[in-house]
Amino acid sequence: MAPEVLPKPQMRGLLARRLRFHMVTGFVLSLGVAALYKVGVADKRKKAYADFYRNYDAMKDFEEMRKAGIFQSVK
């Protein structure tokens, strides 16, 4: 009865293969997170700023602060 021969393990290119896999995975994940941030945070914030400044009246705000006595130089 002959002993069973085990196949030799691959010893070359292990680091390169792992680095390639992890670099691709990291790149794909970073693009996904960036896209989710843009859709979930940046676009909503941009819309909120646009809505605020569409209806913002600086003179009305200034007059309210002047009447409240916030400014010392404006009476």
From Swiss-Prot:
Pfam families per the UniProt record, alphabetical: COX6C
Parts of the chain that traverse the membrane: 14-54
Pathway assignment: Energy metabolism; oxidative phosphorylation
Keywords: Membrane, Mitochondrion, Mitochondrion inner membrane, Transmembrane, Transmembrane helix
InterPro entries named in the record: Cytochrome_c_oxidase_VIc (IPR051389), Cytochrome_c_oxidase_VIc/VIIs (IPR034884), Cytochrome_c_oxidase_VIc_sf (IPR037169)
Protein name in the entry: Cytochrome c oxidase subunit 6C
Lineage of the species this protein comes from: Eukaryota, Metazoa, Chordata, Craniata, Vertebrata
GO CC annotation terms, alphabetical: mitochondrial inner membrane
Cellular localisation: Mitochondrion inner membrane
Subunit structure: Component of the cytochrome c oxidase (complex IV, CIV), a multisubunit enzyme composed of 14 subunits. The complex is composed of a catalytic core of 3 subunits MT-CO1, MT-CO2 and MT-CO3, encoded in the mitochondrial DNA, and 11 supernumerary subunits COX4I, COX5A, COX5B, COX6A, COX6B, COX6C, COX7A, COX7B, COX7C, COX8 and NDUFA4, which are encoded in the nuclear genome.
Family from the record: Belongs to the cytochrome c oxidase subunit 6c family.
Primary role: Component of the cytochrome c oxidase, the last enzyme in the mitochondrial electron transport chain which drives oxidative phosphorylation. The respiratory chain contains 3 multisubunit complexes succinate dehydrogenase (complex II, CII), ubiquinol-cytochrome c oxidoreductase (cytochrome b-c1 complex, complex III, CIII) and cytochrome c oxidase (complex IV, CIV), that cooperate to transfer electrons derived from NADH and succinate to molecular oxygen, creating an electrochemical gradient over the inner membrane that drives transmembrane transport and the ATP synthase.
SUPFAM superfamilies: Mitochondrial cytochrome c oxidase subunit VIc
Residues on Mitochondrial matrix side: 1-13
GO process terms (BP): oxidative phosphorylation
Organism annotation: Macaca silenus (Lion-tailed macaque)
Mitochondrial intermembrane side: 55-75
Membrane topology note: Single-pass membrane protein
